[in-house]
Amino acid sequence: METAQLINALENVPAEFRPVSFWFMNHFLQPDELRLQIREMADKGYGGFMFHGRDGLRSRYLEQEWEDALRVAIDEAKKQGLDTWLYDENHYPSGIAGGKILEQFPGRSMRSLVVSVEERVAPGATVRLELAQAPRYTFAVPATPSSPPAEPINLLPQLTGQHLEWRNPFAGDAVVLVLVEHLYQPGPGILFESYPDYLDPEVAGAFIRQTHGWYRERFGADLGEQVRGIFTDNACAHFGHIRRAIPWSREFDQRFLTAEGSRIEPLLPWLFLSGPAARASRLRFWRFLGDEFIRIFVGAIRTVCDDARIFSTGHYCLEDGMGEHIRQIGDYFAVMKHQSLNAVDQLGPKTKGGSLFEYPRGIAGAESLTACIRNTASAALFYDSPRVMCESFGLASGWRLDLGEVRRIVGFLSALGADLFVPHGLYYSIAGNRKWECTPDHLHNPMWDYSRAWTDWASRLSFLTAGWESVAEVAVLHPTTTLQAHLELGASKTKPDATDLGAVVDRVEATFRDLVNELLYRQVVHEILPEDVLQQATVAEGTLRVPTRKGKSTCTVRCVILLAIRVIEQRTLETLRQFAQNGGSVLCLYERPDAVYDPVTGVLTDLAAGDLPFELFVPADEAVPAPPELWQRLDVRLRALVPQPLEVRNSHCQVISRVWEKWGRRFYLLHNCSAKPQRNLGVTIRDPRPLLRLDLEQSTPATTTVTADHGRFRLDLEAAETVVFVADSTAAAPPYPVVPAAGASMPEQTLALSGPWAFTTNKPNILPLRNGAIQYAECKERHAFTLHACELSGPVWLLVDHEMTRAELICQRYSSRLKVWVNEQLAGPFHPGTILDHWIFEADVAALLRPGLNRVVFETGGIFLENDHRLWNPYLAGAFTVSPQRARPSLTPPIDQLDTGDWTRQGFPCFAGEGIYRKTLRLPDWGEARMSILDLGRLANSAVVFINGHSLGVRVNPPWRFTLPEMAGGTEVQLEVRVINTPENLFGPKPLPSGLFGPVRLCWKLTGNGDL
């Protein structure tokens, strides 16, 4: 693809590269509303949607109503050119088919084998136990095991009923271990209805038949054409809800015997206790667990999806916790290998502008999100997943989430390797409690109208990166084998900054997370290498030729990092030894491997340090977390071994990068992870070809030729900004538009635009009615609210957010159980909503309001907390302002002028929408030749500017500066500034500053004084 063709392709990116929404089907599904929302998604730059049953769904799941709704959605998606994706559950986790599986298989929920008793017994002493539950296994082992280890003693024959009596025959202390089976039972505070037993072939098979088979039977003609794939969510072999426990299932011991040719019982004590047999026992058990989870669930889904010609995708529980993911899914890379499209989730940060690298749970056990996304991207590269899907934003600052923060997160994810973004989520409805699920939402959010400011941009990033080829010459060996060998299942933490997974796992987790972050901070291009892929590599001239895209291409590695790795597989050791002996570099951090495992025989063999020609770069006694000096030394060492194609100085660990090849070109991406600008960055790109900067912001993408001194240049990055460069040998005279480089200085002369602005809004002002009085009488409840009002003209709508019964949903009107009075006059009728939500009904009550004190009363049947009778905050909406001067809210006449500043203090405290500021001005006499901009100062949260009706574009992050078109001085122009905020002021407890704060200035510079 020629560069000119690339620029043209970026202008209209196909649907397959555009965001795919998690579209929450969370209410009673109506054909007209479904079609409306799909048209909106198409208009706002989405490429598809995932039809996702969610909390609040009132249509019947996997029944005729669900089929009819999906058929409507598929039909409209075809008309709009959108892809359809399926989601395999009603809410999550996947596996219960909306509860049908648990009804079919009662008592077949997730099963654990739990330590119920652990008793230390002195030599010659007798232990007597009255057990609360009949045990599955009971063992006795020496507290100080011998080498070779003795076979555990089976104490089940010593049981009389549930009474256990046993005398310790050993010369030293013994440990008695009692293991019982436990079924997952939801309780107070547990989010999920229940986890099924994913390791039970009957249960998993029934789920696949009743879900995937249901879709295949009814929509088979659309599968593989209109329907692209099906998403599995948050499944796992064991949820970790009981800590001193392992995953278990019906006939698990018999399956182990069949698969492994030996009994599982001798392994079980060493999953919980330390001893010479522990590491080999753990390796065999956790690998068998992973194999079973894939065979019964993950792989079975892949098989039916392949047969239906659709992608199997999704993310799995605790994939971002390295030690925990061993317990929950066995082997992350093996799971990714058995999907046809790899996916991951990243739901934060919870605070707007918060760090994308920090973790909430301290050093040990912290979620390794950056590492997990890098793992997923590398898995996609090696196993040939066409995309890296990322479920995004779900817990990212709630209703405060704005498009600037969305862009900051997307740029970060793109730098890590994601290239198919799935906003979590877009609500079908925000009625009732649904509005408190997960942002960013769509129709109900003012930001929706500006969505193309991120969807077009993100689609271009995806188009450039999808199907990339790696240029990494540094690889980090993934420590799966070490984690499996050392995973402890402690009863509690050993110290405040530790987990219950053991010291070795804690060290691996903390150091692996920090290493990946440091490689990102320091622009070291790398891949995460699973052992099965490394074992397929060939050694040549001091390099590892690692197969990528299932052998369709290769990645040439010159340095392999072993981070805190204690155990590796035999073939891995042989490959690395050959690599090192042929001039390759193997750097060991904290540990050299001390044991090698043969997965064929199940034998673990000790290694001596002298057996390994590997460099121990970081000694075992180095502190964790490592001091900055260590990472600096590692950076110097890596660059001496493997010169990096990109370097950024003065970035303060806030700028990360990505380098890849595609279409025979090399691309370089830089992203500012901070919500603050990064100035005067020293960038070096080591590429002899001319360098173009791609401008992905414009409606028509453009380029700038980069002027560099031997690949070195200075760069400013604004808050959350992402820039992409391409090395292009044909770039000497680009036949495409040229735009100014970023980071330029401000013009020299300014003119302040002071005084009030003409002001209006794109929707009615709104006032939530809160702090009302509640009365109960027999089976009814009354909510009473008071407010002041002046004489108002025009309609004033009363919005009722009241959960409906099924009969009311079908009829689309409230029954007589709901009555509303305004000043003792009955209000209504209420109709489906147009202001907030279809299911938040509205009635015009302007004729019932009066000057002075007003009283609004709602009476409804049933108990307040019953789902079908819950009354949520009502709202008043209309052409009014809200005065904050009284204890009660007061509706005052609308205004048509507003000063710059916070509009929540000027009559719009709860307004969520677009404020439109207009001003007529005469341009200053700035001469014939000039460059000029409009600087809006500060605002919240995004803005678009029009001059004489012509849009100057959308800005979602500062600086809030817009380049003006060429106009002669003295010209009179109509200036319009539109500012939108988030829904936080409507739904949140306290208004956030919103609007155009200013100061607003015209700024210009005469040509010859320097470029903008």
Which sequence ranges carry the predicted segments?
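N-terminal pre-domain segments of enzymes
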Residues: 1-12
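Carbohydrate-binding surfaces of carbohydrate-active enzymes
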Residues: 2, 15-20, 24, 30-36, ...
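Extended, non-globular alpha-helical segments
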Residues: 35-43
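Short, aromatic- and glycine-rich surface loops/edge beta-strands on solvent-exposed regions
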Residues: 174-181, 723-727, 855-858, 975-977
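Beta-strand-rich ligand-recognition modules
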Residues: 341, 812-876, 938-940, 944-996
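Repeat-blade elements of multi-bladed beta-propeller folds
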Residues: 931-933
